[in-house]
Regions:
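A structural signal for short secondary-structure junctions
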Residues: 238, 253-256, 263-264, 287-291, ...
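Residues in well-ordered beta-strands of folded domains
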Residues: 92, 142, 202, 211, ...
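Short polybasic amphipathic segments
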Residues: 198-201, 260, 270, 350-360
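Dual-mode signal for accessory low-complexity, basic/Gly-rich regions
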Residues: 271-335, 354
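Short, glycine-/Ser/Thr-/acidic-enriched flexible segments
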Residues: 32-33, 96-98, 146, 206, ...
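Intrinsically disordered terminal and processing segments
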Residues: 322-369
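Active-site bordering "gate/hinge" segments
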Residues: 1-241
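Oxyanion-binding "anion nests"
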Residues: 227-272
Length: 369
């Protein structure tokens, strides 16, 4: 295990975050991820990087929501804001204790907290729009395998560890080399899509189109997410029209939502339905900006072939597409603003098609270009 975590740490420090001597790295995670944090701290320190770690403990979020007055929920987390505003690199390691920890908290309190964090999220999206800009923030999101995620994926912890490490190419003798291959393959797709104006996703119960004219497609190659394997952009906000059905379950703040269908007119979600969790959608679409799309994407990681109820992996499934309501990514040219960014995914391997300016470029989970 130590050997694989050493490889993981080196991949994150050198490839994903491209850390350099004199930089400041902010790590946010739970105490469960301590074994990986130790190796990252070791590797970053060798480079000459100043590291600060924010560990959260079991049920910290629930304790806050259960006990804090509204005035406290409206306060911004001081150090988190400082780090997001001023540090050079940010690594968020997901390592949950319990995926259902905050399921039963008061919805009004959740909304207050979401709105309070919006200004920090805006700083985050602004700084991560271009990691190479003078005030850019290099960021990466990764996973440390825990029992909670293993149970959600219907796997043993050992099986889940194998799944996570395989998705990151950590069993390769040269993980960074594998990700450089991914980068090259996806760059071809990115350059093709950058010349496209109108995109159409078509599958069972789905027929939705949108403009990406003037927008940029991003080659997500394992730097901002580890694992990665997707190309994504931001649709022109008022151009999305049609109906889209998401075949994979989605999780919103610990709540399970299945069989989501959205009807969209001139960019705005005008009707919604879910086989499970429709009330969650009712609450989500009350959030400012949530009725408009911030992202459209295509998953390309064929090392991920099953859902695990974890969006970091599920949205990358080779042969899938996803769309996110809420906040746009600045680097795509997207302009939608919201306190949320929620990805919803559908399988394209059975009957899926993608058209670019009327040309079929993707069929049954595979690119034709």
């Amino acid at each position: 295990m130590k050997n694989i975590l050493e490889k993981y740490a080196k991949l994150l420090c050198h490839y994903s975050l491209e850390l350099k001597q004199g930089e400041k790295l902010y790590i946010s995670t739970t105490t469960l991820a301590q074994p990986l944090v130790r190796e990252i701290y070791r590797e970053a320190t060798k480079i000459g990087v100043h590291v600060e770690v924010a560990f959260s403990f079991r049920e910290q979020g629930k304790i806050l929501y259960d006990n804090a007055p509204d005035s406290l929920l409206r306060q911004e987390p001081t150090f988190h804001k400082l780090a997001i505003s001023e540090f050079d690199a940010y690594l968020n390691i997901r390592a949950p204790f319990n995926l259902n920890e905050t399921n039963n908290i008061d919805k009004a309190k959740r909304k207050i907290r979401t709105e309070a964090l919006t200004p920090i999220n805006n700083i985050y999206f602004e700084r991560t729009a271009d990691r190479n800009a003078p005030n850019g923030l290099k960021r990466s999101l990764c996973q440390y395998p825990t029992q909670a995620n293993a149970q959600a994926a219907n796997m043993s912890l050992e099986e889940y560890q194998q799944f996570v490490f395989n998705a990151c190419h950590l069993f390769s003798d040269n993980p960074e080399g594998e990700w450089l291959k991914v980068r090259a393959q996806q760059q071809h797709i990115k350059e093709y899509m950058d010349k496209v104006s109108l995109v159409r996703y078509k599958a069972d119960h789905t027929d939705i189109s949108f403009s990406v004219e003037g927008r940029t497609w991003i080659n997500s190659d394992g730097q901002t997410n580890m694992p990665s394997g997707e190309v994504f952009s931001g649709p022109v906000e008022d151009s999305v029209n049609g109906k889209v059905h998401f075949t994979f379950a989605s999780i919103f703040m610990g709540q399970d939502v299945q069989g989501i269908t959205l009807w969209v007119e001139n960019g705005e979600v005008v009707k919604w339905d879910a086989e499970v969790g429709n009330k969650v959608l009712d609450e989500v679409f009350k959030i400012p900006g949530a009725k408009f799309f911030g992202e459209v994407a295509i998953g390309t990681n064929y090392n991920i072939q099953r859902t695990t109820r974890n969006i970091l992996f599920d949205e990358k499934i080779g042969g899938s597409i996803h769309m996110a309501v809420g906040q746009s990514y600045k680097q795509t040219g997207g302009k939608n603003q919201s306190g949320i960014h929620w990805d919803m995914i559908t399988d394209m391997t059975e009957s899926g098609e993608i058209y670019a300016d009327g040309t079929l470029i993707y069929e049954k989970g595979k690119f034709l270009i």
